[in-house]
């Protein structure tokens, strides 16, 4: 190998990864063709009153080209409430919600995606799966987060009307490209923080088993515990339609 090639490789090594490359690695690391889990949610309001909810989650496809159905299984008053999410590679998702008590489905308009999803601290937008190419990224530096070396990235949506958030900051674990924390801002004001913990390797995919979502203004938070998680299961596209939304699996 000649000296020019050695100098070129050295320059590439010194340059390191760009913010876009890091974000792409995060997405590629978590790629699977399907996913199923059961979730237990502890919703704590500003008075520390805790309400428990449970749901099931199923997905087919992968980032930017996937469909998912989230269905509440408890408590009894919201059992059967379900959300169909159709994610797209180049724009915000399409969403429909089924409410058994009303026996009707409703399309969730883009301007309503900032609303809380059935009393949790997740917004409808937070439940989407967006492709990395829908954002511009900037590397803010390297930081220790909970004694873990991380990259700190900034992301901004390319289509500003497609997101309630003007900017987000992400802490990404350098060892395995797992997101540990996301801070979401609206017009430079912190509105929502998501922490990811209990990281486990499941079917060769590093996966957070616990998510904590904090609504800063409401002073409330939701802790989601993921159980019975399986990737790459056999599912059919026909299970992810508005008709399927109306019927429990």
List where the protein language model places each region:
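N-terminal mature ectodomain segment of secretory-pathway/periplasmic proteins
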Residues: 18-101, 138
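Bacterial N-terminal signal peptides that target proteins for export
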Residues: 1-6
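Hydrophobic h-region of N-terminal signal peptides that target proteins for export
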Residues: 7-16
């Amino acid at each position: 190998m000649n000296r020019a090639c050695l100098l070129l490789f050295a320059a590439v090594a010194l340059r390191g990864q760009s913010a876009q490359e890091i974000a792409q690695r995060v997405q590629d690391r978590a790629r699977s063709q399907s996913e199923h889990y059961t979730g237990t949610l502890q919703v704590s309001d500003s008075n520390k009153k805790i309400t428990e909810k449970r749901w099931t989650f199923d997905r087919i496809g992968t980032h930017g080209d996937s469909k998912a159905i989230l269905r509440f299984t408890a408590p009894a008053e919201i059992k059967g409430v379900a959300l169909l999410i159709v994610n797209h590679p180049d724009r915000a998702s399409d969403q429909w919600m089924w409410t058994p008590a009303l026996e009707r489905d409703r399309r969730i308009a883009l301007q309503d995606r900032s609303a809380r999803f059935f009393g949790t601290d997740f917004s409808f937008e937070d439940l989407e799966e967006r492709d990395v190419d829908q954002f511009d990224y900037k590397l803010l530096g390297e930081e220790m987060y909970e004694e873990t070396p991380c990259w700190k990235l900034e992301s901004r949506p390319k289509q500003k009307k497609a997101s309630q958030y003007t900017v987000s900051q992400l802490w990404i674990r350098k060892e395995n490209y797992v997101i540990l924390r996301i801070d979401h801002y609206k017009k430079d004001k912190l509105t929502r923080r998501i922490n990811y913990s209990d990281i486990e390797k499941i079917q060769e995919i590093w996966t957070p088993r616990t998510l904590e979502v904090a609504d800063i203004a409401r002073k409330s938070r939701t802790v989601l515990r993921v159980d019975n998680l399986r990737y790459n299961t056999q599912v059919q596209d026909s299970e992810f339609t508005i008709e399927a939304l109306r019927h429990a699996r």
